């Protein structure tokens, strides 16, 4: 096993265990928004501290990306950078909806070498090493081989700025629903991407392209055989927050893009 992968797994499991302890204690009150915010920030801070201590114990000279920093500004960073997402699916956590995760990505010389996504509820560990494929709990994963839109499952991470979306986006949704697609809006795009990599979900539409989250997700899906396109058919687009990405197999993306083109031709 890659030595940094071993440390990443150890760190993400310990961080996930801390989150689960607080999830099961249920100290937060659903109706008290301000108290929940303080409680959640405290959990995130302590989780980051737990994970960071494990990383720095083995790699004291590596950089851990700070919460307010963006990986895009670190593109010329020569040092190894660790990107931690302490809790993806915060609303789910507060609502007792058991769908959230912890993730770590390791970037070496501007290339993502390792990705670890951990679902502490199910104890599912998704790992990926560049050039060595992706795994779920030690077993190799591949993306879905479905070649029809009918009966397919697509996860959606809708835009936080939905008012900026044009009516054409809603026409696309309508067209795809009529084609037989079943949409899911789960609240954790990182875990969705891991499910796409494992073939549990056929495709992911992501309109909230957080670059830091995108790093861990991208390696997982690419190592599982997925492509990442935007809705215009262009490859791997992660800068425009409104265009969104489609993550799936090349065959399924081609089917999606055909339906999208039909919308623009009508």
From Swiss-Prot:
Its cofactor is Mg(2+). It is found in: Cytoplasm. The keyword Transport does not apply. Keywords: Chaperone, Cytoplasm, Hydrolase, Ribosome biogenesis, RNA-binding, Transcription, Transcription antitermination, Transcription regulation. It catalyses: a myo-inositol phosphate + H2O = myo-inositol + phosphate. It comes from the Bacteria. Its EC number is 3.1.3.25. One of its GO terms (cellular component) is cytoplasm. Substrate binds at residues 87-90. GO terms for molecular function: inositol monophosphate 1-phosphatase activity; RNA binding. GO terms for biological process: inositol metabolic process; ribosome biogenesis; signal transduction; transcription antitermination. InterPro entries: IMPase (IPR033942), Inositol_monophosphatase-like (IPR000760), Inositol_monophosphatase_SuhB (IPR022337). It is an enzyme of class 3 (hydrolase). Homodimer. The rRNA transcription and antitermination complex (rrnTAC) consists of RNA polymerase (RNAP), NusA, NusB, NusE (rpsJ), NusG, SubB, ribosomal protein S4, DNA and precursor rRNA; S4 is more flexible than other subunits. Part of the processive rRNA transcription and antitermination complex (rrnTAC). The complex forms an RNA-chaperone ring around the RNA exit tunnel of RNA polymerase (RNAP). It supports rapid transcription and antitermination of rRNA operons, cotranscriptional rRNA folding, and annealing of distal rRNA regions to allow correct ribosome biogenesis. This subunit may play a central role in organizing the structure. Belongs to the inositol monophosphatase superfamily. This is Nus factor SuhB. It comes from Buchnera aphidicola subsp. Acyrthosiphon pisum (strain APS) (Acyrthosiphon pisum symbiotic bacterium). The lineage of its organism: Bacteria, Pseudomonadati, Pseudomonadota, Gammaproteobacteria, Enterobacterales.
């Amino acid at each position: 096993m890659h030595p940094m992968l071993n440390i990443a797994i150890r760190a993400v499991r310990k961080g996930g265990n801390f989150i689960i302890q607080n999830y099961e204690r249920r100290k937060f009150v659903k109706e008290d928004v301000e108290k929940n915010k303080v409680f959640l920030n405290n959990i995130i801070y302590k989780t980051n501290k737990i994970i960071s201590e494990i990383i720095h114990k083995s790699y004291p000279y590596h950089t851990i990306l700070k919460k307010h920093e963006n990986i895009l500004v670190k593109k010329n960073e020569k040092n190894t950078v660790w990107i931690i997402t302490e809790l993806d699916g915060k609303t789910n956590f507060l609502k007792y909806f058991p769908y959230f995760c912890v993730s770590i990505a390791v970037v070496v010389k501007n290339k993502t070498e390792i990705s670890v996504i951990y679902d502490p509820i199910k104890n599912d560990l998704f790992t990926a090493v560049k050039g060595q494929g992706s795994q779920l709990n030690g077993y190799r994963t591949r993306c879905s081989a479905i070649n029809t839109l009918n009966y397919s499952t697509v996860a959606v991470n809708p835009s936080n700025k939905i008012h900026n979306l044009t009516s054409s986006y809603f026409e696309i949704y309508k067209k795809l629903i009529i084609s037989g697609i079943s949409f899911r809006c789960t609240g954790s795009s990182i875990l969705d991407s891991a499910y796409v990599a494992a073939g549990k979900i056929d495709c992911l539409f992501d309109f909230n392209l957080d670059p830091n989250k995108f790093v861990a997700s991208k390696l997982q899906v690419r190592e599982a055989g997925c492509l990442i396109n935007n809705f215009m058919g262009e490859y791997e687009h992660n800068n425009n927050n409104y265009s969104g990405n489609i993550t799936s197999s090349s065959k399924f993306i081609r089917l999606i893009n055909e339906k999208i083109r039909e919308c623009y031709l009508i």
